[in-house]
């Protein structure tokens, strides 16, 4: 399994466009891994996690084509994770040739909100209609939390995120070819039910990717902080949910308390995890 980080920032990217805080200034000076687009990830070349606003820029900048994407797991409908205008580029009216069918997976709440937005702002028809399926070469799949389902060659289980009440936000455990990854953003501390299900299902992850919106100087609120990431990683190790060679990565990184990449990476190293950056490719 190959995991490509298309973006690793929180909602407003990093540095933030109009911000002159120390962290944003330093990120602009250093460039490189300190410059972050909004979070999304690609597994192998066919499974996208989040149809985010920056995926096209990431694809072009990283030389990572998306034309073989067959599946999309949508975490939730917030604008930094879901840009429905990308779906219009699947329409014949845009001259698109050869796009494979896209199987799109999301919770009922996410799909209902997306359908309303799509019809109101973009196309004049519902994303859940047969018209959308025909024009966009799209198949919609409604998923439930704590249920397993098959996505092409992948076995997936969705978990309820501790985030955005009423929007059906999801986290995902994904397994293929003997490799297992947990993609855990956006979320505040994981629910007890999630931990219980990890144990009941005897899950054991090779890679864990966690929300790291707030840095070492900030408390976690609606998202995880650096110290909460450390706590989650340590708990996973103590409960045997990760192997001895498993890796834990931070993503969804905001300027609030998170320094530019070199300093944040050094902090993470001292505490047993790593910091993802845009364009990072993991071989699992």
Which ranges hold each PLM region?
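Alpha-helix termini
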Residues: 63-64, 90-99, 121-131, 200-203, ...
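Residue-level recognition of the N-termini of beta-strands and the immediately preceding loop/turn
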Residues: 69-70, 100-103, 133-138, 205-206, ...
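Active-site neighborhood of phospho(di)ester-bond hydrolases with catalytic His/Asp-centered motifs
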Residues: 48-52, 69-80, 105-107, 182-187, ...
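Core dinuclear metal-dependent hydrolase active-site scaffold
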Residues: 1-64, 139-196, 280-284
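Metallo-beta-lactamase
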Residues: 98-101, 107-168, 273-278, 282
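Cap/insert and terminal regions of metallo-dependent hydrolase folds
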Residues: 188-283
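Short, well-ordered amphipathic alpha-helices
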Residues: 56-60, 85-92, 114-122, 227-237
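Active-site metal-binding motif and surrounding structural segment of the metallo-beta-lactamase
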Residues: 46, 52-105, 206-208
């Amino acid at each position: 399994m190959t995991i490509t980080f298309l973006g690793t920032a929180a909602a407003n990217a990093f540095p933030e466009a109009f911000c002159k805080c120390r962290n944003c200034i330093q990120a602009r000076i250093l460039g490189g891994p300190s410059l972050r687009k909004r979070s999304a990830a690609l597994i192998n070349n066919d499974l996208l996690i989040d149809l985010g606003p920056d995926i096209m820029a990431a694809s072009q900048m990283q030389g990572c084509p998306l034309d073989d994407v067959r599946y999309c797991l949508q975490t939730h409908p917030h604008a930094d994770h879901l840009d429905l205008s990308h779906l219009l580029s699947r329409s014949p009216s845009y001259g698109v040739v050869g796009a494979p069918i896209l199987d799109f997976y999301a919770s009922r709440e996410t799909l209902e909100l997306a359908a309303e937005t799509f019809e109101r702002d973009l196309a004049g028809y519902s994303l859940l209609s047969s018209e959308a399926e025909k024009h966009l070469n799209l198949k919609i799949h409604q998923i439930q939390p704590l249920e397993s389902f098959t996505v092409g060659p992948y076995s997936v289980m969705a978990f309820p995120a501790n985030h955005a009440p009423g929007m059906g936000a999801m986290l995902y455990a994904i397994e293929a070819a003997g490799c297992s990854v947990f993609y855990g953003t956006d979320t505040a501390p994981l629910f007890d039910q999630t931990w219980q299900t990890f144990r009941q299902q005897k899950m054991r992850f090779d890679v864990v990717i966690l929300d790291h919106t707030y840095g070492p100087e900030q408390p976690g609120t609606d998202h995880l902080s650096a110290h909460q990431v450390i706590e989650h990683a340590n708990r996973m190790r103590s409960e045997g949910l990760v192997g001895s060679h498993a890796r834990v990565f931070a993503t969804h990184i905001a300027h609030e308390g998170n320094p530019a990449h070199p300093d944040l990476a050094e902090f993470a190293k001292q505490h047993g995890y790593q910091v993802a950056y845009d364009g990072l490719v993991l071989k699992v």
